[in-house]
Amino acid sequence: MAAVQGQGQGKLLYIVVVDDDGATFRYTRSLLHSTLQLMGCKPRHAFEISGRVFDEIRGHMGGDMAMGGGGGVQRYELAADAEAASPRQFQFELYKRRTTLLIPRPLFLRLVCHALALYKYVAPDQRSDLHRACRIRERKESVTILLCGTSGCGKSTLSTLLGSRLGITTVVSTDSIRHMMRSFVEEKQNPLLWASTYHAGECLDPVAVADAKARRKAKKRSGISTTSTIDFDKTRPLNDKPDGKPIGKKQMAIEGYKAQSEMVIDSLDRLITAWEDRKESVVVEGVHLSLNFVMGLMRKHPSIIPFMIYISDEGKHTERFAVRAKYMTLDPTKNKYVKYISNIRTIQEYLCSRADKYLVPKVNNTNVDRSVASIHATVFSCLRRRAAGDQLYDPATNTVAVVNEEYKNQCVANSMSSKGMFKLIQRLGSSRKLMAIVNVDGSVSKAWPVESSSGDGKGGSENGSKKYVGDPIYGPLNIGRAESVNLQFGAFGISAWPTDAGCTSQAGSVNESWDNANEGTGSHVPSSSGSPKKLDGHCKEIKESAAASGSDDDEEEEEEAADVPPNSGSEEDLSEEDIRAIHEEMEGSVDEDCNRSDEEYDDLAMRDCMENGFLTDDGVVHTVFDGNGQKHSTLRKRQVNLRTLSKIDLDSPDTARSSSALPISASSKRNGTRRWKRSLSESFRSRPRSAPSLVELTPKHKGSAVPEVAPDK
């Protein structure tokens, strides 16, 4: 009986958050970790903060954690008809009672904000951001992210990494929709559907295409609005030629791409409708997301946030197709993508021109890590704007100026703080704290007055309406005290802080920073004695852009886009240093260091499982209790396995842990892997901490000392 009691007091697997209206949602530790990562916390910090929240609530399982003016932590009570259920169901209800606690929503938010404050996270409206992330995770709201772009620009890689970063499990490619549609029709019946987008124009009749374009242009001149379609069969006689210019190869490639995209968009429309009804967030990527049709989808689905992915350098774009060939070759006779690279680039030029027309943000995918971070920050900023009542899609102009503005804000913020550090400072002789961007030389680039935090989680904002951050301050400041702080989304998070105009827009604060940030070729750090700038950068662009029509009737623009490539990042206007910086980057590939932070918490989960006695994802308990209810340490064999897997051996260096019995090739490969992969012990020794780790927070019971393991000789 004592063992069962000790085990019941040691386990907390579920936290049921109760709203004022009685609605509930169950959080596990991994789900809370995903929620914190969605709101912009680092993966490692999100893991530790989620564990800290569970440990704090677990310490109050015996009693109630009182909250001023509200309820506290309560145990999960059995249902009234639980005893009448089957014995198996009754045992499960007893298990849930031992492992579940109920907590009101305000107390839950306060505890998480308190843990964020301990890890030095500061934000203008941190509590509202947390509540917004919880609504997405609890499926009270949804977001649909569309990654448009041609073949080989990195959409699939971005969608996978973005889904992992946002905690979105549904990642759909339009190629899978096309593959599903192919199962209902044979290739002979519809060759257009079975063709690839870059050579779909070969399935069209140039005469029929020219005739349809001529009729559409004539009806447009007469003032009749219609959505004409192209006759895709080849039954029209070739000698029946319409009047006008002959259709070129580039224009035929675009027409074939648009024709196949139109066939796929209809099925995607129905899928998005079902996802929005279920409040399910999703990431959709694919070449079939033509921006003309995307604008039509945004009229019906307010949850859509589009992005245009492209590769500016044609040479780097071509090199990415080498991995798709059988023999890793760029020979056009053996690599169909290289064979049709001209059509692929033509489609990209067409999509870039459409993106400029509809103000869809264009992401130059020269670095996957930076692209994922910028898209993540932009998506959450759009969620803030949507919660404030702003519409992402403007039906009057048929543009998404809000999304484009927020993306530019993120890029400008990243360029502003790329060479600075975020610190919470105090001026000499003043007790007021300032959140500042401190340059490498120690000068202050920009600072914001913030309300002093008393350590109870109220440093950001206790409610969503009260303001705790003042207007920015410029000029040299005499720093008396400084401490490092963390921002949500890292360098991109500075865009959420107020500007001179009293809003959170950074679009017009730095001259020409957007061009450098968009191309990834440079950064701009404002001067420490700079003067405030006016917010007029993006407003002028919106006023000058005419109301864009969402149809394909703009023949002159389409033909011009097909013949004259737009300025989508050519190297002619760049300096030699910028060109060198572009070529030195790993364009379109994942840097070996970019995903380390996302994978570090896996090692922490392993260590936490062995030391604290439970897994974070599935709740499996590995702790052994004795007759007195005390927790024993794990076995020696488990400690040896832990040391082997996680390399936690503080008594011997890495060289002593390498086995001399292994072959030379295996040993050298192991040493080579160790040079680029950061071990868990090194991260614990070298990384400075602003809050105690989970191991230090775990209470030490008698008899739980970990046996010492002798190092391998």
Swiss-Prot record:
Residues 231-246, 533-544 have a biased composition (Basic and acidic residues). Gene3D superfamilies: P-loop containing nucleotide triphosphate hydrolases. Residues 656-668 have a biased composition (Low complexity). Residues 504-531 have a biased composition (Polar residues). It comes from the Eukaryota. InterPro entries: P-loop_NTPase. Residues 218-249, 504-575, 650-713 are annotated as: Disordered. SUPFAM superfamilies: P-loop containing nucleoside triphosphate hydrolases (SSF52540). Residues 551-562 have a biased composition (Acidic residues). PANTHER family: P-LOOP NTPASE DOMAIN-CONTAINING PROTEIN LPA1 HOMOLOG, P-LOOP NTPASE DOMAIN-CONTAINING PROTEIN LPA1 HOMOLOG 1. Required for the accumulation of phytic acid in seeds. Phytic acid is the primary storage form of phosphorus in cereal grains and other plant seeds. This is P-loop NTPase domain-containing protein LPA1 homolog. It comes from Oryza sativa subsp. japonica.
